[in-house]
């Protein structure tokens, strides 16, 4: 892509709160396209969304032993994630306090300490400054306790590692709220929990991070129309006819009561799952001992064996597909680019052949070269390209689908539930929470919106 196509569009500075409040109109279902392109809004996102939200960093099985570490990002801030001797996890800014060079330049490994390659300042695995070259001769008054990198709060949920820079933010359990119920469809099917398949895929898409987060939060609509038709046909089992693959009409969409999280799923017909993940994975998830145990653990046959092709986003940038078992973080790289970091989880006690089949099918479908992943990326990239036009940014997008069709008292599913899986209720929830974060000066103000 031409370099100019990813250059930020700067059209104004110093957005006022009253102006930001006009960018999303939930009652009318209107989205101002400038939220996907404006550089000044993006800089405010880094401060008010990414510096204050619980962000997914990885899985606990990425760092099994003391000293195991990996490097990743919180927003655009690089961080180091390290397993401690007491089995806890430390997360700290990957920035030396001397001149700002990275403390750790490796993707992952095991270490007893980290040494900056520029001037040799060294830090222990908790991020504490422990050694400064020529300290006695040149830094007579240096208090090393004052010169450690910034440390983040760390909490986990059923194997997933989250971190937050804001000491005043609510705890992770409260932040996730009802979303935990839906996360469990992938994370808690067995008492053994989940483990990662080794390796993280990383690729860059020239589009705004919100397009990706919104689709995984709310958009079953594209899957039920034409976007993935060619990939579905390619994966069609020989004993199924195309006529058998009419998209299911029964399903639900979940919008968090507060927090911007969302999910959607079909209920019942496994044929679409067969076309996407093949008979081996589909059988494992819907029938036999593993499915029966999952149904018992999750509390119903429907939750354990009947939910198909679920999609979900935990606000802002943690997304996954239970059943496909891909988990990814959408790392923002300016208003016009996102870096995707994706990994696959499996039930820790699943047979080896099932784990291998999940690995193979996820690579085929939702990976850097996956058939469905490329469909999604093509749409997002083209939208972002079109939004370089002045007129293209001047008219609102429609987000009216299934407005006024939610209930708050579903007998099984918590949160605000739409009984029409083809809904944009969760998308409206995501943008409504984005707006709260962009217009709230601190977490005390955010708590008041709950």
UniProtKB/Swiss-Prot annotation:
Coiled-coil blocks: none
GO molecular function list: 2 iron, 2 sulfur cluster binding; benzene 1,2-dioxygenase activity; iron ion binding
Domain of life: Bacteria
Residues bound to [2Fe-2S] cluster: 96, 98, 116, 119
Any matching Pfam family: Ring_hydroxyl_A
Pathway as given in its UniProt record: Aromatic compound metabolism; benzene degradation; catechol from benzene: step 1/2
EC numbers, comma separated: 1.14.12.3
Cofactor note: Binds 1 [2Fe-2S] cluster. Binds 1 Fe cation.
Enzyme class: oxidoreductase
Keywords in alphabetical order: 2Fe-2S, Aromatic hydrocarbons catabolism, Dioxygenase, Iron, Iron-sulfur, Metal-binding, NAD, Oxidoreductase, Plasmid
Cofactor(s) it depends on: [2Fe-2S] cluster; Fe cation
An example Gene Ontology biological process: catabolic process
Binding site for Fe cation: 222, 228
Catalysed reactions listed for this entry: benzene + NADH + O2 + H(+) = cis-1,2-dihydrobenzene-1,2-diol + NAD(+)
Every Rieske domain range: 56-163
Family: Belongs to the bacterial ring-hydroxylating dioxygenase alpha subunit family.
PANTHER family: 3-PHENYLPROPIONATE_CINNAMIC ACID DIOXYGENASE SUBUNIT ALPHA, CHOLINE MONOOXYGENASE, CHLOROPLASTIC
Quaternary context: This dioxygenase system consists of four proteins: the two subunits of the hydroxylase component (BedC1 and BedC2), a ferredoxin (BedB) and a ferredoxin reductase (BedA).
Annotated protein name in UniProt: Benzene 1,2-dioxygenase subunit alpha
UniProt organism field: Pseudomonas putida
């Amino acid at each position: 892509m031409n370099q100019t196509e990813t250059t930020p569009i700067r059209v104004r500075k110093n957005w006022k709160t009253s102006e930001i409040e006009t960018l999303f109109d939930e009652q009318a279902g209107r989205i101002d396209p400038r939220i996907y392109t404006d550089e000044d809004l993006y800089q405010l996102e880094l401060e008010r969304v990414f510096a204050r939200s619980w962000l997914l960093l990885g899985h606990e099985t990425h760092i099994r032993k003391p000293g195991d570490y990996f490097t990743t990002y919180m927003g655009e801030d690089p961080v180091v994630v390290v397993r401690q001797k007491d089995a806890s996890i430390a997360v700290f800014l990957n920035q030396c306090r001397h001149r700002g060079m990275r403390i750790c330049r490796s993707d992952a490994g095991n270490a007893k300490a980290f040494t900056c390659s520029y001037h040799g300042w060294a830090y222990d695995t908790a991020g504490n400054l422990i050694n400064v070259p020529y300290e006695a001769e040149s830094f007579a008054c240096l208090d090393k306790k004052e010169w450690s990198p910034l440390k983040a709060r760390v909490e986990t949920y059923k194997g997933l590692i989250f971190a937050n820079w804001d000491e005043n933010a609510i705890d992770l359990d409260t932040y996730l709220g009802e979303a935990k119920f839906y996360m469990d469809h992938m994370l808690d099917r067995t008492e053994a929990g989940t483990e990662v398949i080794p390796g993280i895929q990383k690729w860059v898409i020239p589009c705004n991070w919100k397009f990706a987060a919104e689709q995984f939060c709310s958009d079953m609509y594209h899957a039920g129309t034409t976007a993935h038709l060619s990939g579905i046909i390619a994966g069609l089992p020989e004993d199924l006819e195309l006529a058998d693959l009419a998209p299911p009409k029964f399903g639900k969409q979940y919008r968090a009561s507060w927090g911007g999280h969302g999910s959607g799923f079909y209920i019942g017909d496994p044929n679409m799952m067969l076309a996407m993940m093949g008979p081996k994975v589909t059988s494992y998830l819907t029938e036999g001992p593993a499915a029966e145990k999952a149904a018992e653990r999750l509390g119903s046959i429907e939750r354990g064996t009947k939910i198909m092709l679920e999609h979900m986003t935990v606000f802002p940038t943690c997304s996954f597909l239970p059943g496909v078992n891909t988990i990814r973080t959408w790392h923002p790289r300016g208003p016009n680019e996102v870096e995707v970091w994706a990994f696959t989880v499996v039930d820790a006690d699943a047979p080896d052949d099932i784990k291998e089949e999940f690995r193979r099918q996820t690579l085929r479908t939702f990976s850097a070269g996956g058939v469905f992943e490329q469909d999604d990326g093509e749409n997002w990239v083209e939208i972002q390209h079109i939004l370089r036009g002045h007129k293209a940014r001047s008219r609102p997008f429609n987000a009216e689908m299934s407005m006024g069709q939610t209930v708050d008292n579903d007998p099984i599913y918590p949160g605000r539930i739409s009984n029409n899986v083809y809904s944009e209720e969760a998308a409206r929830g995501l943008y409504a929470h984005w707006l709260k974060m962009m217009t709230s000066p601190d977490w005390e103000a955010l708590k008041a919106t709950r």
